[in-house]
């Protein structure tokens, strides 16, 4: 899997504010420490991977998300879980620097507290489940 990192050397996110920058740093650091791969951007959507990886890592199964989604009343994306499970499997992972442009109109739909709680719960839960 190749990740286009907003925080790798020379790259910048022009869409981040103080809260999202802090959250990305917090989750990327915790995923790196808990699951064994040093990421610079474990949350980003910009990635290249084989579609068979989705099935290999059970990302296509509702049970991979349903506990967090029910507990915190929100839908979450698979990018953090993809980062976690790829690291746990010891898969080839590379990061390349890439800028994230500023948001071009529209409103951010970020649910900071719900998503933050759901992703942290998922991150910790993955220590004990899905081998």
Q: Where in this protein do the model-derived segments appear?
A:
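Acceptor/aglycone-binding surface of glycosyltransferases and processive sugar-polymer synthases
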Residues: 1-70, 103-111, 120, 124
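Histidine-centered beta-alpha loop that forms part of the nucleotide-sugar donor binding/catalytic region
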Residues: 6-7, 76, 98
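Catalytic donor-sugar/metal-binding loop of nucleotide-sugar-dependent glycosyltransferases
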Residues: 37, 60-61, 80-101
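A general structural signal for well-ordered alpha-helical segments in protein cores
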Residues: 23, 27, 79-84
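A charged, well-structured terminal subsegment
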Residues: 127-131
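Charged/polar positions on well-ordered alpha helices
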Residues: 85-88, 118, 122
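Acidic donor-binding loop at a coil-to-helix junction in glycosyltransferase catalytic cores
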Residues: 65-82
């Amino acid at each position: 899997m190749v990740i286009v990192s907003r925080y790798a050397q020379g790259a910048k996110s022009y869409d981040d504010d103080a809260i999202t920058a802090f959250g990305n740093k917090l989750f990327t650091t915790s995923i790196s420490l808990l699951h064994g791969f040093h990421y610079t951007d474990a949350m980003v959507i910009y990635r290249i991977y084989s579609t068979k990886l989705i099935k290999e890592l059970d990302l296509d199964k509702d049970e991979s998300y349903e506990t967090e989604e029910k507990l915190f009343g929100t839908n979450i994306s698979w990018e953090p879980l993809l980062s976690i499970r790829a690291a746990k499997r010891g898969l080839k992972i590379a990061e390349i620097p890439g800028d994230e442009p500023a948001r071009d109109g529209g409103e951010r739909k970020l649910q900071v507290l719900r998503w933050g709680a759901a992703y942290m719960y998922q991150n910790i839960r993955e220590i004990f489940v899905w081998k």
